[in-house]
UniProtKB/Swiss-Prot annotation:
Belongs to the arabinose isomerase family. It is an enzyme of class 5 (isomerase). This is L-arabinose isomerase. Keywords: Arabinose catabolism, Carbohydrate metabolism, Isomerase, Manganese, Metal-binding. Catalyzes the conversion of L-arabinose to L-ribulose. GO terms for biological process: L-arabinose catabolic process to xylulose 5-phosphate. Pathway: Carbohydrate degradation; L-arabinose degradation via L-ribulose; D-xylulose 5-phosphate from L-arabinose (bacterial route): step 1/3. It comes from Tolumonas auensis (strain DSM 9187 / NBRC 110442 / TA 4).
Amino acid sequence: MEFLKQLEVWFVVGSQHLYGAETLKQVADHAQTITNQLNEKAGLPLKIVLKPTGTTLDEISAIARDANHSEQCVGVMVWMHTFSPAKMWIPALSQLNKPLLQFHTQFNKDLPWGEIDMDFMNLNQTAHGGREFGFMGARLRLPRTVVVGYWEDKGAHEKIARWMRIAAAVYDSRKMKVARFGDNMRNVAVTEGDKVEAQIQFGYQVNYHPVGDLVKVINDVSTGDINALLDEYETIYTLTDAVKMGGAYRESLYEAARQELGMKKFLQDGGFGAFTTTFEDLYGIHQLPGLACQRLMQQGYGFGGEGDWKTAALLRTLKVMGTGLPGGTSFMEDYTYHLEDGNNLVLGAHMLEVCPSIASKKPVLDVQRLGIGQKAPPARLLFSAPAGKAVNASLIDMGNRFRLVVNNLDVVDLPQSLPKLPVACALWEPKPNLEVGAEAWILAGAAHHSVFSQAVDAEYLRTFAEMMGIEFLLIDENTTIPELKKEILWNEVYYKLCK
């Protein structure tokens, strides 16, 4: 995610000329101090760039226009140091097409009780200046985030950092290219969707690329590059005897390395952020790309199996959000249940393609037979996810809108080993429990594929949905089926009448 180092958030401080030159100078000085401190000490993922103080309609509008056209600016953070009449902000807010955060803070932490005079009161007016700005945001029906807190407090820093990560994911989404190697799995419904509407809504450029074009790139990979990658495998994974030098499946591992290098080159050369494969279209490919997909996900690419481009794109989005955070993010599928009384669990996995960023221990690299796809036994990494909090997220096309469904999870350690299971996995209890969680997921129409993450939580995804203007449904410990049904019906009416 090297591109994140080039991105920035613009900081615009609102005031007006009513208070005079001396007050405006203090406003500018305070804004610079806050900017410097946030950049140097807050641990934010993106750089803050202070813009000139917004004191007139024309000044503020010019900043918004520049923000829209900037290739580095992913969002705008505003602060009303003094009172800044909100009618001055109407043109800017009406045209701004980047995420917006209102930082409701003030320069001084404590009131100087014995020293307060009207000069102090005129300078430090965020308490009511922020409310004036907030009214205009509400009046214009703007999706926006409000962070309330002192600018040196860790809690405020964490909220700003969260918003920055989501804004960066929106920026990435607007430019995202998704390569589809083959089509969707035949006759599957939920992996379909309106690609034109997806580009309008999210920016996704989803296009088909013949598998034969990929095969040409794979076949051109050099022996030296393959051997170097095999050396890397031997360094970072535990290899089974079957794939070690001289092992029965060493040649299959060699082909898997060739696949990874070829696929990565294709994606890099084309500027793709996500991709899909399907076991029904492997013409010219030696084996189903399992290991390659796993490792490319760990490098930040979005992936979807069976042509699932919506999940691939969403996975890329969560990879961007979670960059540098503890915990991993992976393509996932609800595979089978454990229905023990009082301990109902879901075993999540896929045929091969689970990202090792969620591995609790050093993965095992192996080659085993796969009874689907009718190709040679494929390479794969074997591991399980660590216990802890997680989410499953599913993006679906409802015809007149996109819906993002999120379920909070409690991931648990495997109670027993799975010596015959030849794929990576995670074991979890959905919130509030399997009975309600699964029923709610099904009623919402969420897919059998999902994005599983232990790096970001549901609030990241709620804010992302707000920024993108799509429907959001959360299944958590407070969910009840009657209330969820009502929410679905209310949303249906809203999107038919208001969108």
